[in-house]
Amino acid sequence: MVLMIVSGRSGSGKSVALRALEDMGFYCVDNLPVVLLPDLARTLADRQISAAVSIDVRNMPESPEIFEQAMNNLPDAFSPQLLFLDADRNTLIRRYSDTRRLHPLSSKNLSLESAIDQESDLLEPLRSRADLIVDTSEMSVHELAEMLRTRLLGKRERELTMVFESFGFKHGIPIDADYVFDVRFLPNPHWDPKLRPMTGLDKPVAAFLDRHTEVHNFIYQTRSYLELWLPMLETNNRSYLTVAIGCTGGKHRSVYIAEQLADYFRSRGKNVQSRHRTLEKRKT
């Protein structure tokens, strides 16, 4: 059974995540005091029910040791996973402005900007031990819920899920990436007027990139690097490995290479997911 602990800065989407987990059959509790985690887990263990609990700045323990003690006292039947949601500062400010809600730390007479910054410091102990960090800055409510459904329902127990994610550097580097590879030096289909409207998922773009030796060399050396360290990553008790591939716009080169790497590791029996940030953003 899974005990999913959902945390993150206020406004990053914890309530949305909890509702999505409830739809997936998790028993969900919002803002449960950390010290009660073992009691909740023992109660649910007999019923064979996976649980999801949100922890935010309002119910953070006074010291990280209290959280560690609670985790150590969980029944063996539960496999704890920590999901940390985040968004960039400007996005959080905009979301609070849109909803006109008060920040949990506003009672300390802090400005919204100062409250967001202080909350980040207070939640750092949880962020640092998270199994999965998700940047929701560019996600809608529905995209966040769908992403969680895809990642959690697609994950096999005790198996590392490899996520290959394409992005454009001009849109920013994904904060949930474990590895970032820059492919802006590779031949660019953008300069071919016929290929410019297409994406790295289209066959003519794939054929263009496939003709270049440096593209093959990059893919080979990148997958060799990942294969070298994958056994150690798999034994490091982590649930996800996110590999981000970036080009200028996130439309051609990064998409093609992310798909090539995903197909390679999928063909070798790995649990693989692929995501294309720029292409997904264009659909909305």
UniProtKB/Swiss-Prot annotation:
Region of interest (RNA-binding), ranges: 266-284
Q: Which GO terms describe its molecular function?
A: ATP binding; GTP binding; RNA binding
Does the UniProt entry include the keyword Nucleotide-binding?
A: yes
Task: Quote the Pfam families the UniProt record gives.
Answer: PapZ_C, RapZ-like_N
Binding-site residues for ATP, renumbered to this chain: 8-15
Q: Where does GTP bind?
A: 56-59
Cited InterPro entries: P-loop_NTPase, RapZ-like, RapZ-like_N, RapZ_C
Q: Does the keyword Nucleus apply?
A: no
SUPFAM superfamilies hit by this protein:
P-loop containing nucleoside triphosphate hydrolases (SSF52540)
- Per the record, the domain of life is Bacteria
Q: Which UniProt keywords apply?
A: ATP-binding, GTP-binding, Nucleotide-binding, RNA-binding
Instruction: Name the NCBIfam families on file.
Output: PRK05416.1
Per UniProt, subunit arrangement is: Homotrimer.
Function description: Modulates the synthesis of GlmS, by affecting the processing and stability of the regulatory small RNA GlmZ. When glucosamine-6-phosphate (GlcN6P) concentrations are high in the cell, RapZ binds GlmZ and targets it to cleavage by RNase E. Consequently, GlmZ is inactivated and unable to activate GlmS synthesis. Under low GlcN6P concentrations, RapZ is sequestered and inactivated by an other regulatory small RNA, GlmY, preventing GlmZ degradation and leading to synthesis of GlmS.
**So what family is this one in?**
Belongs to the RapZ-like family. RapZ subfamily.
Q: What is this protein called?
A: RNase adapter protein RapZ
From which organism does this entry originate?
Answer: Citrobacter koseri (strain ATCC BAA-895 / CDC 4225-83 / SGSC4696)
